[in-house]
Structure formats: structure tokens, C-alpha cells
């Protein structure tokens, strides 16, 4: 019976992969040259003009790309906005995404996807524990699910994992995930899909973080793209007052594409005017930045929404019309935008206690995960799996003592601009996101509890005991003399 189920999973995966490759052939993949994105067919410079898209909130376990009715409702609205890219924070890798991905492709919209979920991510409390084979199985299964879609622009290995000076040690494990993802993509013979990191704009370590993820002699361990969550331009600001001029200097020698993975300060009296669009898509910034994504599509509790959703009804807010107007009137720079062809990667920052505590020697990939490189990740486990459950459990006491930390890094941190300081005097408070804050711990705990209700005996095994299917999968394969 189990073998029959696993065989069925193989057939389903093959069918979805075939649907993916046949549905997106008309969408040219995006490739990287120097520090810029380019259309692989036309050769034109590609600038991200997008929005962050996660109806229900970015720490929600709901997958917006697995519900055909949601995509039928929202994609025409996204098309009307004039965008070419969406960023999605959480997906269920066990679901069928072919309808939504095809609809996005038909409307010229690319996807940047975070591979983590609120219950499967690198834990800030114990990154070493959460970096385990079961976590990587979930990451690799997400890659398997989406890699055949040409309109997947890239994957984020982490989002705002480093949200304070005290969490810089987690960078070591996120960088290991970058390495593992890039090696997995190569081993599975997928096209060269960019893998990056989305950073909080924290003055104390933003330069160190950028350098760290782009340093070292091992190319697979260096990111392909760097996203910055930046809320420094508020209202009718300017290139200098907002601090954008400082960011230009900071990243001017960066060898991979840099873009704003979240932007759109809402600390304004009424609606957001989005005057920063004129700067972002100008020759003043195009030599370094490749566009950005506005936070966010749907209006949630933090009031950053462009639209209000009520069932199947979408109401466009004033912010939507303002952004649409800015996108429509501001063209991309002509030619290649002055991009750099330099491939000089950064020098690794030195370890310094209390300042930068990331190690330049990365941990070896968990040995149990090596089988996935030849066989694939196996059956996707979806959002019901909690790969950091044992890590969170042993840190319960720490959670009670530290209200400001978040327990995972799957989406954005609960207060992006509070942690992401800038030269601008304003402070933004982006309240929902992928790395649940202490106030959101109950969501993560509930999901973990639901997952473990029938697996209470696994706790003694550590994180490796949480996902059993892949181990059984490998054992059966070996029994039938399959090469893994």
C-alpha cells in the first residue's frame, strides 16, 4: 500500500512538472549578467516592478498560489496595476500551482518565492538545530515544485533572519542554505535559478550582511541576488533625505543584482504617494538597483494594503491608484541602465563578538540530505510539517524571557522598520510578516502542535525524527535497488 502511494506521488509530480514546462514556454526566463537582470530572449535589462503578495498576511500558512479562485480574482487586478513581479512568502509545496502559475505567466508576471514557511525555517533561537535534513527536504521539495516554471525569477533562502545585532550568528546557517539550494538546483539539472537573501535594512550591520552573503571563494555559497526591505522614503521625500543616496554608495561595488524586496513607508497623513518610484527607475539608481516590490497587495492589520479584500470582491484603495499612476508614467532607463559587469565578490567580514558573529566556515550539509541530490526530495510535506519543532520546544524558556525575538525566519519580521533603521527620521512599523514575533508565537506553536499530535514520541529523536516519509522512501528505494 505504501509503495503504491509513493508511486502515485511520483506520477503526480511528473504530471505537474509536465504541466509546468508546457504552460510557461512563452515566458522568457530572467538571467543575471553582472549586477543586473536581463530577459533571456530579448537581451533587454529587466527591472522588477512588483508587489509583495500574500493575502491573509505574510506569516499566514495559506498558499495564495494553490487556490485557483484566488488567482482568478487577483491576477487581473495585478495586471491592471502594471506590475511584472510578485513576491510570495509562503506556499504549500504539496499543492498544485499550475493554474496560478500559468495565469501569472499569461499576464507577464514573474514570481520571487521565499522557500521557508512559519513552521519550517532557520530558528533564531537555535539555528544549528533547525538546520537539519528534514528542513532541507522541505526546501528542496519547494524547489522541485516550482523550478520548471520559467516565470520563477528566483528563490529567497531567508528573509530578515538577521534582525538585530544579537542574531548575526544565524547568517552562517542561512548562507549554508543558499549553498545547498544552489547545489541542489545544479544536481537536479534545473535551469540556473537565482537564489538570494532578503535583508532588513539595519544600520548596524547592513553592510556586513551584504558583504557576508556575497563573499568567499565558493561560488555556490554566494547569493545570486540581494533584496533589501527598506521603508526610508516616506511621503514626499527625496533621494538624499530618504537615505537612498547613501544606499547607492553602499552597494555601488556589489557584484550581484540589488533590489528593494519591500518598500512603501505608510507613515503619511493619508495615502502613500509613491514618489520614490521616480527615483528607483531612474539613471540615478539604475547602475546599482534593479527595481523593487511594494509592500503589500492586500490590506492586513498593519495597513499597508493596496486593495481591500472581502470574499471574492476586491476594492482598489487610493494607494493602488497612486502606485498605478506612478508605474505608468515612469519608464525604465534606456539601454542597459549603466549596470556593472564586474564579478568581484566581497571580502568576508571578520568575526567580532557583539558586532558580527557569523562564521566564515559554513557547517557541512546534514548527511541525510545528500540522497536528495540524486533522487529528488520525494513527496512534498506541505505546510503541516514543523521542522524546527524540537528546537522551539527546548527554547520555550528563552521565548518567555525575550519578547523581541522571533522564533523563525520564514517571511518578514514583525517590525521591519523598527529594526530597519535608516537615515530618514521616520519610523515604520510593519506588523505582520514571516518571522513571527513573540506575539505571533501562538501561530507557530499551534502549527507545530498539530503536526506533532501523532508523533509525540519523535521528540526524543530530535529534528530528524519529525519527517519520517523521506527515510521510508529511501529505504524502499534501496530495497528495490534504485540508485539514490
Curated annotation (Swiss-Prot):
(1,3-beta-D-glucosyl)n 1 binds at residues 89, 159, 295. It is a lipid-anchor; GPI-anchor. Residues 463-484 form a propeptide. GO terms for molecular function: 1,3-beta-glucanosyltransferase activity. Disulfide bonds join 71-100, 215-348, 234-265. Pfam families: Glyco_hydro_72. A lipid is attached at residue 462 (GPI-anchor amidated glycine). One of its GO terms (biological process) is fungal-type cell wall organization. Residues 383-462 are annotated as: Disordered. The keyword Lipoprotein applies. Gene3D superfamilies: Glycosidases. GO terms for cellular component: endoplasmic reticulum; extracellular region; fungal-type cell wall; side of membrane. The active site is at residues 160, 262. The GPI-anchor is attached to the protein in the endoplasmic reticulum and serves to target the protein to the cell surface. There, the glucosamine-inositol phospholipid moiety is cleaved off and the GPI-modified mannoprotein is covalently attached via its lipidless GPI glycan remnant to the 1,6-beta-glucan of the outer cell wall layer. Glycans are attached at residues 24, 60, 166, 299, 344, 359. It is an enzyme of class 2 (transferase). Its EC number is 2.4.1.-. SUPFAM superfamilies: (Trans)glycosidases. Belongs to the glycosyl hydrolase 72 family. Present with 11700 molecules/cell in log phase SD medium. Splits internally a 1,3-beta-glucan molecule and transfers the newly generated reducing end (the donor) to the non-reducing end of another 1,3-beta-glucan molecule (the acceptor) forming a 1,3-beta linkage, resulting in the elongation of 1,3-beta-glucan chains in the cell wall. Involved in cell wall biosynthesis and morphogenesis. This is 1,3-beta-glucanosyltransferase GAS5.
Amino acid at each position: 500500500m505504501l509503495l503504491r502511494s509513493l508511486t502515485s506521488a511520483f506520477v503526480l509530480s511528473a504530471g505537474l512538472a509536465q504541466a509546468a514546462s508546457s504552460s510557461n514556454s512563452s515566458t522568457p526566463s530572467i538571467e543575471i549578467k553582472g549586477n543586473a537582470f536581463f530577459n533571456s530572449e530579448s537581451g533587454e535589462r529587466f527591472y522588477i516592478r512588483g508587489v509583495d503578495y500574500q493575502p491573509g498576511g505574510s506569516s499566514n500558512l495559506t498558499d495564495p498560489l494553490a487556490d485557483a479562485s484566488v488567482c482568478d480574482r487577483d491576477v487581473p487586478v495585478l495586471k491592471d496595476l502594471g506590475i511584472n513581479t510578485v513576491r510570495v512568502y509562503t506556499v504549500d509545496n504539496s499543492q498544485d500551482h499550475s493554474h496560478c502559475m500559468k495565469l501569472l505567466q499569461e499576464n507577464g508576471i514573474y514570481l520571487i518565492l521565499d522557500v521557508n514557511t512559519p513552521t519550517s525555517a532557520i530558528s533564531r533561537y537555535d539555528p544549528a538545530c533547525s538546520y537539519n535534513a528534514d528542513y532541507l527536504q522541505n526546501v528542496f521539495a519547494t524547489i522541485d515544485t516550482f523550478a520548471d516554471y520559467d516565470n520563477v525569477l528566483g528563490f529567497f533562502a531567508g528573509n530578515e533572519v538577521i534582525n538585530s545585532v544579537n542574531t548575526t550568528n544565524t547568517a552562517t546557517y542561512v548562507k549554508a542554505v543558499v549553498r545547498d539550494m544552489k547545489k541542489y538546483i545544479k544536481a537536479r539539472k534545473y535551469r540556473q535559478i537565482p537564489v538570494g537573501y532578503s535583508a532588513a535594512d539595519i544600520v548596524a550591520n547592513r553592510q556586513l550582511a551584504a558583504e557576508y552573503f556575497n563573499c568567499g571563494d565558493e561560488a555556490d555559497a554566494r547569493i545570486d541576488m540581494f533584496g533589501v526591505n527598506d521603508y526610508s522614503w516616506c511621503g514626499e521625500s527625496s533621494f538624499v533625505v530618504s537615505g537612498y543616496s547613501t544606499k547607492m554608495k553602499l552597494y555601488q561595488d556589489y557584484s550581484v543584482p540589488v533590489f528593494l524586496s519591500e518598500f512603501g513607508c505608510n507613515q503619511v497623513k493619508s495615502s502613500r504617494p509613491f514618489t520614490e518610484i521616480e527615483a528607483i527607475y531612474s539613471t540615478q539608481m539604475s547602475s546599482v538597483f534593479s527595481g523593487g516590490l511594494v509592500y503589500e497587495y492586500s490590506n492586513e492589520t498593519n495597513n499597508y494594503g493596496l486593495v481591500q479584500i472581502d470574499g471574492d470582491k476586491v476594492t482598489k484603495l487610493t494607494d493602488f491608484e497612486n502606485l498605478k499612476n506612478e508605474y505608468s508614467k515612469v519608464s525604465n532607463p534606456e539601454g542597459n541602465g549603466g549596470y556593472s559587469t564586474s564579478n568581484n565578490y566581497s571580502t568576508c567580514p571578520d568575526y567580532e563578538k557583539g558586532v558580527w558573529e557569523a562564521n566564515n566556515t559554513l557547517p557541512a550539509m546534514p548527511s541525510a540530505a545528500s540522497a536528495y541530490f540524486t533522487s529528488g526530495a520525494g513527496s512534498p510535506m506541505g505546510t503541516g510539517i514543523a521542522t524546527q519543532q524540537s528546537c522551539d520546544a527546548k527554547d520555550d524558556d528563552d521565548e518567555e524571557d525575550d519578547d523581541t525575538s522571533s522564533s523563525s525566519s520564514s517571511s518578514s519580521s514583525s517590525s521591519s522598520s523598527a529594526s530597519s533603521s535608516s537615515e530618514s527620521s521616520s519610523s515604520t512599523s510593519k506588523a505582520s510578516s514571516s518571522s513571527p514575533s513573540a506575539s505571533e508565537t501562538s501561530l507557530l506553536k499551534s502549527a507545530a502542535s498539530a503536526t506533532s499530535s501523532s508523533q509525540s514520541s519523535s521528540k526524543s529523536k530530535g529534528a530528524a525524527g519529525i519527517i519520517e516519509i523521506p527515510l521510508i522512501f529511501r529505504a524502499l528505494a534501496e530495497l528495490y535497488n534504485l540508485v539514490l
